[in-house]
Amino acid sequence: MAELNAPAPAPPRRGRALAWVLLGVVAFLVLLVVAAPAGGVARILEAAGAPARLALPSGRLWSGSAQLYLEGRDLGRLQWDLAPGSLLDGQLGADLVLEAPGHRFRGRAGVGTDGRLQLTGVEGEVREASLDELLRPYAIEPSGTVTFRDGSATVQGQRVLDAHADARWSGGPVSYALGGQLWRQRFPPLDATLRARDGQPVLVVRDPAGEELLDVALDAAGWAQLRVRYRFVALAGFPWPENPAPDTVVVELAEQLY
């Protein structure tokens, strides 16, 4: 009796064709991202309702730059380079550089599927020009430079979930108006740390001996709470009617930042 051999199966042409189609679609999307103008980033921020705004974009969506504004304030020129490797961690990440005449920062930003913004590896410096602009509304004229290192933060919406950074001010002469008089004092270099405490970012400033001078806490409602210890008042050379212990909190202020 003759054996009947079943015909060989046809090659999976349909599956191969589908794979080529998908590969073509992916290549087309990658080409769109690479070739898209940098203005697309500004439109994405606007659609997301972010408080930041980009103007005068140049370059491409993949690698470009634009002028960064936050709450209407010009923060300088922002440069970005998308980091495709961050997609393996479930994030859309980019290496960033922010530069202005009075400051320069660099680091990496990533947005996860949960909408959280993560900043890592932040370092930079704030020079006298930006320090003066920042403190002028409080009748303070500083000098010197503040350097930052080991900076990181996690932000969701307008809430700061976690924050970490170390900073150092080079010190120098400072003029300030208080009690209807103008005071001048030379300060030594001061160190500061930014840490999360009870779910709130807290900035602590210390003297060269490591003793606390003041601290600022930012709560979930956008209020910054400032506490000044007598040790700082004495360091500033301001006469105080009493002579309390150095750790005594003598000034408490609150200001809503957002």
Protein language model regions, located:
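Hydrophobic membrane-insertion alpha-helices, especially the h-region
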Residues: 7-37
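Beta-propeller and related beta-repeat scaffolds in trafficking/envelope systems
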Residues: 78-87, 160-201, 239-257
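Short, hydrophobic/proline-enriched secondary-structure or compact coil segments at domain edges
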Residues: 94-96, 116-124, 165-167, 202-205, ...
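Non-cytosolic head/periplasmic domains of membrane-anchored proteins
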Residues: 105-189
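Extracytoplasmic/luminal low-complexity segments enriched in Pro/Gly and acidic/polar residues
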Residues: 199-258
